[in-house]
Amino acid sequence: MPMLAFALSFYFSLSTAFYFHVGEREEKCIIEDIPSDTLVTGTFKTQQWDFRRQDFLESAPGLGMFVTVTTYNDEVLLSKLYGPQGRFYFTSHSPGEHIICLESNSTRLVSFGGSKLRIHLEIRVGQHDLDAAIAQAKDKVNEVSFKLEHLIEQIEQIVKEQNYQRDREENFRMISEDTNSNVLWWAFAQTLIFIAIGIFQMKSLKNFFIAKKLV
């Protein structure tokens, strides 16, 4: 994988915005000299070349951008896949040069027409602004909210399954009680029938004996 690197000099606490062209799946890296314990904010937007219009589109739908940040000691500070546009943050742990690399994750073959992507990039070094803090807080809140919603859905599903099992057990209990009640009444009815038959047979037998003058 080719790696095209170019060094840019930035003043501390300044924001620099620029754009560059790359081919799909081509990696472009920026070298930053950053003091220690410094927040760095990067904002990027990807535009895709349209052959029919012979111009860049406003966005690159379906395309992702893989952002990695490393030091010259090979310490990885950031490695994350974003969409066609996004914002990333990292904090330097030690002073020195840091390498910020961007690479699209397109699976299509690079066309013969040259660079087909335009990447707008803005780097802010040493700006602990409120927007960055709010964005980081929102990311954490969104992550927690997503996990909480997923947990609530699981709890609701468990409650539904418990209610379903409870209903089944209640129906089974009612059916069992009805069956037992029917069996009991049928046994009682059979007993009455047997008693009635016995009384009838005894009376018939007595009448027979009387008729035959045996008693």
From Swiss-Prot:
Residues 129-171 form a coiled coil. Keywords: Coiled coil, Endoplasmic reticulum, Glycoprotein, Membrane, Signal, Transmembrane, Transmembrane helix. Glycans are attached at N105. GO terms for cellular component: COPII-coated ER to Golgi transport vesicle; endoplasmic reticulum; endoplasmic reticulum membrane; endoplasmic reticulum-Golgi intermediate compartment; Golgi apparatus. GO terms for biological process: endoplasmic reticulum to Golgi vesicle-mediated transport; Golgi organization; intracellular protein transport. It comes from the Eukaryota. InterPro entries: Emp24-like, GOLD_dom. A motif (COPII vesicle coat-binding) lies at residues 208-209. It is found in: Endoplasmic reticulum membrane. Residues 186-215 are cytoplasmic. Pfam families: EMP24_GP25L. Residues 27-125 form the GOLD domain. A motif (COPI vesicle coat-binding) lies at residues 208-215. Its main location: endoplasmic reticulum. Residues 1-17 form the signal peptide. Residues 18-167 are lumenal. It is a single-pass type I membrane protein. Belongs to the EMP24/GP25L family. PANTHER family: TRANSMEMBRANE EMP24 DOMAIN-CONTAINING PROTEIN. Part of a complex whose function is to bind Ca(2+) to the ER membrane and thereby regulate the retention of ER resident proteins. This is Transmembrane emp24 domain-containing protein 11. It comes from Canis lupus familiaris (Dog).
